[in-house]
UniProtKB/Swiss-Prot annotation:
Role noted for this protein: This protein binds to 23S rRNA in the presence of protein L20.
Quaternary structure annotation from Swiss-Prot or TrEMBL: Part of the 50S ribosomal subunit. Contacts protein L20.
Keyword rRNA-binding among record annotations: yes
Pfam family, one: Ribosomal_L21p
Keyword annotations from UniProtKB, A to Z: Ribonucleoprotein, Ribosomal protein, RNA-binding, rRNA-binding
SUPFAM superfamilies to which the protein is assigned, alphabetical: L21p-like (SSF141091)
UniProt record similarity statement: Belongs to the bacterial ribosomal protein bL21 family.
Xref: PANTHER family: 50S RIBOSOMAL PROTEIN L21 (PTHR21349), LARGE RIBOSOMAL SUBUNIT PROTEIN BL21M (PTHR21349:SF0)
Coiled-coil boundaries: none
Protein name, UniProt field: Large ribosomal subunit protein bL21
Length: 103
C-alpha cells in the first residue's frame, strides 16, 4: 500500500515503514503526526485518486528527529568589478517514519 501526501508545499509518495525528510514541523521527537491531505491511495491495482483529496484517508507517522540539511553555497558576483559575495543556507527538516495508511 502507498499514498501521496502534501506537506510543506511538496508532494511525497510514502509507504508504511519508510523514512522521509520533510519540511520542519513544530512537533517533538517521538510524537506522532497525522497527514490528512492525501492525494492518492494505491494498493496493487486498486488506485483511489482524490479530487483534490481522498475523503477519509489519513497517513500516520512518527517523528524520528529534527535537523538541518547540508549547506547550500550561493555565490553572487559582478563581472569585471572585483566584487564577489559568498553566502550559504542550511534548511531545517523533520525526519519521520510512516507507521500506517488508513483509506
Amino acid at each position: 500500500m502507498y499514498a501521496v501526501i502534501v506537506t510543506g508545499g511538496k508532494q511525497y509518495k510514502v509507504a508504511p515503514g519508510e523514512y522521509l525528510k520533510i519540511e520542519k514541523l513544530e512537533i517533538a521527537t517521538g510524537e506522532s503526526v497525522t497527514f490528512d491531505r492525501v492525494l492518492l491511495v494505491g494498493n496493487g491495482d486498486d488506485v483511489n485518486i482524490g479530487a483534490p483529496v481522498v475523503a477519509g484517508a489519513t497517513v500516520v507517522a512518527e517523528v524520528v528527529s529534527q535537523g538541518r540539511h547540508d549547506k547550500v553555497r550561493i555565490i553572487k558576483f559582478r563581472r569585471r568589478k572585483h566584487h564577489m559575495k559568498r553566502m550559504g543556507h542550511r534548511q531545517w527538516y523533520t525526519e519521520i517514519k510512516i507507521t500506517g495508511i488508513q483509506a
